[in-house]
């Protein structure tokens, strides 16, 4: 059996190195209501995010519905599987189900078409606890991230990893020195799963482990874009930059945009100008790669944008933290606005029986005037959200106020229904108590003595009529 699975934490108390995250999860679970916000676990792979979610379900005795990257996550499938589960009760009664949606930062491509929008809709309507998991917080859609409470997971410390490896060696009856354990802990870079797998790979067929055995099981650590961009502006050695660019999963055009975004943060204006020249040359190589389909040029483009910009900055660093390309945010905003307008037109077209295209081209201004008279009523009638009302009213604050009014009214109605139900329940309980009291006040019914055994009645003896004796004459 795989040791990573064999020694997976079974309870939240077993999660190592992330005490603050565990406390936040426990507080959320104990006070959870249908109005509670979902949790978003973020952090690098192998530090216990999925294990914490499963342990939470086990500790709270909740059922689990898990949707991860191996599943098809189109809009239709997500709504059919997770959507139905988020609004229904447990299979075994009124218990809760924990819905775990893993790798929400990888919702892209044809396989996940419409998935982010479907998940956002589910988060708004869910009546069950939901946990979302992502390796990269920046990769999560804004429409999802703003609906969740973040729970950051940190890399596990070396001493904590070393202590856990020692426990596993004791359970498996394997001799392992402190130097070997230290090598595993340092090589795993805070990743518990990798550390356990390294220990398993090094101990296969052995009863003791040395440092030499550990060297054959080093972690295949993938560099992040933050490692690469940070190395470029921190003046990392050329060989290290080449290694980071090789290990980074980002494509060269994406890396170029990340580096370009950080160039304005350089201290020296003259160095900034020369750095832009390096980026321009890298862009030329990328263009030739696409036109000629000669992907060998990628290496020259990558070297120009990393080594070239690093040489111009000369390790001077920059003034703030690394940020994703701002153009991505603008593109995302434009795409979001387009999607909101389309969904708004669909809602209005259904309400007024007018084609969506005609709604967008001819009737939005007219409907805006209608909405301005009573925004809350318009919002409630067409079941619109804040973004859709913002397009109608051209005022985000007014849109938020209208939606808040509708939500408050709905909440008051729900509270009223709950109070009426509670009142009826109390009345029924009171009536039952009164009936029970009346039963106690009724005089006891006297017990009837047991009936004596009936004796069979003797039939009256009729007087025997004696027949007259015949006189016997004795003539003789």
From Swiss-Prot:
SUPFAM superfamilies: P-loop containing nucleoside triphosphate hydrolases. Residues 435-476 are annotated as: Disordered. The keyword Nucleotide-binding applies. SMART domains: AAA (SM00382). ATP binds at residues 43-50. Keywords: ATP-binding, DNA replication, Nucleotide-binding. It comes from the Archaea. GO terms for biological process: DNA replication. GO terms for molecular function: ATP binding; ATP hydrolysis activity; DNA clamp loader activity. Belongs to the activator 1 small subunits family. RfcL subfamily. PANTHER family: CHROMOSOME TRANSMISSION FIDELITY FACTOR 18, REPLICATION FACTOR C SUBUNIT 1. Part of the RFC clamp loader complex which loads the PCNA sliding clamp onto DNA. Heteromultimer composed of small subunits (RfcS) and large subunits (RfcL). NCBIfam families: PRK04195.1-5, PRK04195.2-2. This is Replication factor C large subunit. It comes from Methanocorpusculum labreanum (strain ATCC 43576 / DSM 4855 / Z).
